[in-house]
Amino acid sequence: MNNLKWVVYFLKSRKNWIFWILFLNILMLGISLIDYDFPIDSLFYIVSLNLSLTLIFLILTFFKEVKLYRHFEKDKEIEEIKHKDLAETPFQRHTVDYLYRQILAHKDKVVDQQLQLNMHEQTITEFVHDIKTPVTAMKLLIDQEENQERKQALLFEWSRINSMLDTQLYITRLESQRKDMFFDYVSLKRMVIDEIQLTRHISQVKGIGFDIDFKVDNHVYTDIKWCRMIIRQILSNALKYSENYNVDISTELIDQHVALIIKDHGRGISKKDMPRIFERGFTSTANRNETTSSGMGLYLVDSVKDQLGIQLQVTSTIGKGTTVKLIFPLQNEIVERMSEVTNLSF
């Protein structure tokens, strides 16, 4: 079937040749009908010989030319085709040389763009680290504020700024996340409590508490830094779209896998928005006046969860709230997945 495909392609590309040869032979036959002295037997012999030689020529040309395209079909690199001199005709060699030059030019552009991206990432990272210093100093000044109402309001805004900086830092590290991961058994409860502590200024202002119920062994095999980032983004969303309600945090065992469940009682997510919640920059269509959301939180979560082997399930009801379930992998599943990735890279 594959050979038939190449035959069809070849005949289509050589149809002008074939029509011209057929026209010449038909023309000779037509002339012989006019010239009665021309021997018919000789004419049929010439036409038959001509068509036979043409057929042989087309067959030889087909096998010679299609060989190069078979190499392309096997996804051979153009460098290999060039250096092994797999292009046989001058026209094929000219085509391969052109493609080779174009690939080299595009590779140079990709290298330049990658350097620019690396410089941009480094600049953003340095900026975030540099601005963390005055932000930390700001926190010390806020702690000295004696007016509790003003202090609480300042801490609320400080927490938002600090969270935005952390989010931006993680965004710049997305491309290198695989190199930045170290897996170990860590306490899920400890991670959750640490993240709650970071958001306490926001939750206090909004009148939100946390009901924690850890029913199963809460040690999971994960990267603590990136896992905390996921928990932080989910808690941030729960606080952002809730007010004067508690956030329920619990664990359960699903087929020997530890599952973390974070449930808020906020405004919920509409059905039409649900398929898009992980898109970069997407914000809810329910309230277009909402300006505090960047649409990056769940995008970050979705970008990292597969590297951590975490299954993510989101259910929501408008007016009743949203439930996010994180199902953590077993150690052998992570080791197996990392082995597969390592084998693919070689």
Swiss-Prot record:
This is Sensor protein kinase GraS. Its EC number is 2.7.13.3. It is an enzyme of class 2 (transferase). Keywords: Antibiotic resistance, ATP-binding, Cell membrane, Kinase, Membrane, Nucleotide-binding, Transferase, Transmembrane, Transmembrane helix, Two-component regulatory system, Virulence. InterPro entries: 2-comp_sensor_kinase, HATPase_C_sf, His_kinase_dom, HisK_dim/P_sf, Sig_transdc_His_kin-like_C. Its main location: membrane. It catalyses: ATP + protein L-histidine = ADP + protein N-phospho-L-histidine. GO terms for molecular function: ATP binding; phosphoprotein phosphatase activity; phosphorelay sensor kinase activity. It comes from Staphylococcus aureus (strain MRSA252). GO terms for cellular component: plasma membrane. It holds the Pfam family HATPase_c. It is a multi-pass membrane protein. Residues 126-332 form the Histidine kinase domain. GO terms for biological process: cellular response to phosphate starvation; response to antibiotic.
